[in-house]
Amino acid sequence: MNMKPATAKISSVALKHNIQTIKQKAPQSKIIAVVKANAYGHGVVFVSAAVEELVDCFGVARLEEALSLRSNGITKPILLLEGFFCDKDLPVIAINNIQTVVHNVEQLEALKAAKVPNPIKVWLKIDTGMHRLGVALEDVEYFYQALRDSENVDPQIGFVSHFSRADELECDYTKLQLTRFLNATQNKAGEKSIAASGGILFWESSHLDWIRPGIIMYGISPINVPAQEYDLTPVMTLTSSLIAIKQHKKGEPVGYGGIWVSDKDTKIGVVAIGYGDGYPRDIPTGTPVYLNGRRVPIVGRVSMDMLTVDLGAEAQDKVGDEVILWGKELPIEEIADISGVISYELITKLTPRVLTEYID
């Protein structure tokens, strides 16, 4: 008997392929590889080491993420996409060659007043319509001049913004955001970045000096269309094993609440993964998994540690056989569409109980 529990298999070959695809889509742009949230659940150290030679910078959300990269040998620049949270972080940022976004007056004043050993590279974040982080359009000039006047700031100031609807392929609001960004930064020295994954795929005019691939770097589409259509390869394959096969009678229910009742004699397979591993509890009956070259449907309610599938009466599957929950054989975008849980959330909500296997 040889059964493996829930395992996320992470492919460096797929990662590198996706970076090359991204470069082909935006050949004139430099790349900030977004590896926040443990590289979208893929393992930040493995991912960053795998692509460091292919990218120009890394993007993270927290200083702790940046310092983890530094302590694990990553030497490329790192950008704090939300900026710094505490005044005391600034000397650490300077010493470790970490760049920071500035998006509010509190950060600006802290930066001006800080005692740092060397100037810090700053990206001024502009709110062009996301209305989350960023300085107002009418305040860009003030912030820009204040940053230029500070000895604590590297004179090469960058400009950054973020689309709110780049995944809508025909959206005038995205065009408006780009126009606002270009107008706000015209006649100002400094490199510009507004395109994340949606912008890279669907809005070529937004590529500018830097692009910030996130979800597409991991071979997942920002819309519920399989990423393979954009020449992207899934980096993660989520697998588990059949741990039991049960003969099941017509008219008998399966699982908690008896919400599914078989209309025929069949075989039920029990798979060692559940919501305790991060697989969605509310996923509906009929959602496919991939087993021995075919799709079979989940039946009954997903429980904490297991789910059940209808193998069919004539199934030849065996205990220990590998089951794929998503990956190249079964696009995560399809699971996202069925479950109502976006792919970003599916991959980042996997729990520590899921083993990670780095391959290639």
Curated annotation (Swiss-Prot):
Lineage: superkingdom: Bacteria
Which cofactors are reported in the record for this sequence? pyridoxal 5'-phosphate
Sorted keywords for this record are: Isomerase, Pyridoxal phosphate
Please give the SUPFAM superfamilies that the UniProt record associates with this protein. Alanine racemase C-terminal domain-like (SSF50621), PLP-binding barrel (SSF51419)
Chain sites annotated for binding substrate? R132, M304
Top-level EC class: isomerase
Name the chemical reaction catalysed here.
L-alanine = D-alanine
Under the heading InterPro entries, the entry gives:
Ala_racemase (IPR000821), Ala_racemase/Decarboxylase_C (IPR009006), Ala_racemase_C (IPR011079), Ala_racemase_N (IPR001608), Ala_racemase_pyridoxalP-BS (IPR020622), PLP-binding_barrel (IPR029066)
| Keyword check for Isomerase | yes
One Pfam family from the record? Ala_racemase_C
Give GO terms for biological process: D-alanine biosynthetic process
Active-site residues are K36 (proton acceptor), Y256 (proton acceptor)
Q: Explain the purpose of this protein.
A: Catalyzes the interconversion of L-alanine and D-alanine. May also act on other amino acids.
- NCBIfam families for the chain: alr
The name this protein goes by in its record:
Alanine racemase
Q: Which organism is it from?
A: Pasteurella multocida (strain Pm70)
Its encoding gene is what? alr
